[in-house]
Each structure stands twice: as structure tokens, then as C-alpha cells.
Swiss-Prot record:
Organism (species): Shewanella sediminis (strain HAW-EB3)
Protein name per UniProt: Undecaprenyl-diphosphatase
Highest taxon above the source species: Bacteria
One function term, GO molecular function aspect: undecaprenyl-diphosphatase activity
Function: Catalyzes the dephosphorylation of undecaprenyl diphosphate (UPP). Confers resistance to bacitracin.
Gene this protein is translated from: uppP
Organism ancestry: Bacteria, Pseudomonadati, Pseudomonadota, Gammaproteobacteria, Alteromonadales
Keyword Cell inner membrane found: yes
Amino acid sequence: MDTFQVIILALIQGLTEFLPISSSAHLILPSQLLGWEDQGLSFDVAVNTGSLLAVVMYFRHELWSMFKAWTDSIITRKQTDESKLSWWIILATIPAVIVGFTAKDFIETYLRNTAVIATTTIVFGLLLWWADRMFRPGFTEFQVGWKKALVIGVAQAMALIPGTSRSGATITAALMLGLSREAAARFSFLMSVPVSLGAAILVTKDLISSGQTIDYQALSLGIIVSFVAAYTCIHLFLKLISRMGMTPFVIYRLALGAILCAFMFA
């Protein structure tokens, strides 16, 4: 990829990773519109690393408090709000790990296509609208509990289907379970840390074992661009979500799904 492609694709990944609009649906558009080739493993490493650094940096104080409370809970058996939240996030990560390891090849072979992405973009967009309109949530992320955490974790596992959107699926589930908009988003973003870390490790392992030549300039640029885009996106989303709700993202998803359908039948 040339520098322009790296910047555009890293921007797309960074901006869409934490919005409920599906990054995979957007990353398929350059190939459809411009005929760009697959981004390659180096790019995957870059954007996964950039997104991970962004969410860790943004929630650095919360994550540090959670980590200390979690280690204390193991040593002293004392549970606090932060330690409970840590355990719930660990629990919520398990379904995605199981599905990721057992169904990765099936998903990549049979589900990563325009038809699936267009369908899931529309269907899960409508579910997001329903969850946001029909429920009157008020819980915080510290009131999730292990049952709700597991349900949200299952939603995160379902988001391995391209076009679903990890943040979209988890926020939808959290809203249905009674969390406030901001709490649903915060829990979703905190959940992304172990998932993004695991993805970055696995893709890096694949890159090393593939023997591909690493373009360190493109790798560095991709990390920087995706980091800045993702960090900005997280900040603005949390700042505005309570006031504007999910409707703008639902409308956007429906329009994007329609565009992808148009490409299929063109």
C-alpha cells in the first residue's frame, strides 16, 4: 500500500472501531469503489495496535485502578466496585475467545463477503435503534453483574460476524439490559482492551510466521493515524452520546447497508 492508502484505511479503522457502525463494512468500501487490494498483515498489526493504545490511554486511570483492585481481590479476597468490574470484563471476554478460536476459519471463508456485511449492517442497526428507543436505562457499568456481563460477552462474540460491529453489538446488549447510554459505551470500550490485545498478539504472530517483509514506515504511520482517530472518536462519542442517542448511527448504518446492497446488484 502507498502512503495515501495507509492514511485513509487507518482513519477508517480508527474512526469506526469504537462507533457502532461496523469497521468491516467500511473497510470493504475501498476495494469496491477503488479496487484497492487487501491491506495485508502489517496493516492489521498497525490498526489493532493503534486502537489498543488509544483506548488504554483514554481509560488509563480507570484501567490502573481496576488492575490494582483486581490484584488485591486475588490476594486479599476483598471485592470493590473496580475489582468486580475487572472480573466482569474478563468473564465477558470468554465467549469471544471461544468463538474466535473455534470459528475463525469458517467466518473468514464463508462470512466475509458483501452480502453478509450488508445484511448484518442493516439488521444490527435496527436492533440498536430498538434497544435505544424501547428501553429506559439507568444502570452504571459498576452495576452490571456477572449475568449481564456474560450476555454482553455473547453479543461481543456475535460481533465476530463481519458487519455486526463489536461496539454496536455490545452497546445494544448493554442498553437492553438496562445500562445508561454512557455506561453501555464505557463498558463496551473497556471490554475492547483484552480483545484488542489478543487480536494484536495473534496478528503479530501471523505476520512473523508468514515471513512477509515488514514495511516499518507504513506500520508506524498506521499506528499513529489509527491511534489519533480512535482516541478522538472515543472522546467525542462519550461526550455526545447521552444527548444525541443512537439514531444518527442507525440512520448511517441503514444508508451504508443500502449502498453495499447497491454494489451487489449493480
